Structure formats: structure tokens, C-alpha cells
Amino acid sequence: MNVKFFCNRGMNLLEYQVNEWIEVNEVEVINISFCTETYGYSTTYYCSVLYK
């Protein structure tokens, strides 16, 4: 199973939670939110992850 993150560069995946799990064109896509430390504080980003 290959996992590909569609997010900005320079983000460290510290923790994440699954918000949504859907199938698009026979490809499973989940929307997750995760926290990354940038300049001393944590920020939550949202992105999609493809599982093949």
C-alpha cells in the first residue's frame, strides 16, 4: 500500500486524525488534519491522502 500526502513542503507529520473516508474513481481518499510545529507553535493543516 502506497501512501501519498498532498500537502505543502516542509511539514512534519506529528499527529493526525481521519476526518473523512471516501472513494473517488476507485481510489480511496481520506481527508486528515495534522499538527506541525513551525516557528515554535503548532498549526493544523488539512490535506488528502491517497491509498493505492
Where are these regions (language model features)?
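A short, exposed loop/beta-hairpin motif centered on an aromatic-Gly-Thr core
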Residues: 1-10
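Short secondary-structure junctions
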Residues: 22-30
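Hydrophobic beta-strand residues in large extracellular and virion-surface proteins
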Residues: 29-32, 49
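Short, solvent-exposed loop/turn elements at beta->coil junctions and helix N-caps
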Residues: 33-39
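C-terminal edge-of-domain segments
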Residues: 41-52
